[in-house]
């Protein structure tokens, strides 16, 4: 009788332990696993990542989501390594922050949903010829494109005496190439001459900036991650040379520019996070979800640079808060 009771108790305890193990697995498996690939570290991309994380954790609950953030430090091969690791880990969704991260993620998986942000032109990034606003594959997301015709008009508005505009960008970034081509078309149609200066990486930024400052009246820089990570190199040359820089986004403008048509990277990150929630929680299909663009645009300027260059800024521009040196 004693032995029987002991066996029953032992079996009962085993069942409880096994149940606890499976309950633990169940709780762990119920978490949504998201891998974030950020192409490189600079203010705009950092804000987009922050917005995404805030939106996801607020909607799903921090206890119900496991987010792994990896930064590729501007290296496309590292983007690919991170993407492949996320696929091997079996994440539920990949957030790709910027073009290189998106391209690496798309190459790594055709089944795991990918939500991108800080990508200027998805058709260019994904090589989609017939663009309809949706990708038709496992990719959706938000764009950081501010209207390029308005950016071209800003150059003429702030620098009315300029005759030659220099466009600086990294030739390795497809979205920068796209922006540069469109802005060049707009500037040419406005009667301005355009010189194009490209770099392969950050090591060439100083040399192309020096050349541009000797040959143009104003510089335009699109949303370019390579230059965004090294704006000091541009500022140290363009500032003393007295050449104004009009930037495609606020982070670059803070670093070396006079003015920009600004979007909020935090906001496009938030919207990307909301799209991720729609996919994870409601089963939305990324292949049919419209790529979304920022709707709130603000003309912004850096007061100290505008003053130093003698540029009169219209009243509809908002001053960018400058950090004290």
Q: Where do the protein language model's features map onto the residues?
A:
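Hydrophobic alpha-helical segments within soluble ligand-binding/sensing domains
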Residues: 122-164, 263-284
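Extracytoplasmic "Venus flytrap"
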Residues: 33-53, 59, 68-78, 172-176, ...
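Beta-alpha junction/loop-to-helix N-cap segments that form part of ligand/metal-binding clefts
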Residues: 68-130, 224-239, 243, 248
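Short, solvent-exposed amphipathic alpha-helices that sit
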Residues: 44-60, 147-151, 175-193, 233, ...
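Short, low-complexity disordered leader/linker segments with a strong preference
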Residues: 1-33, 58-62, 88
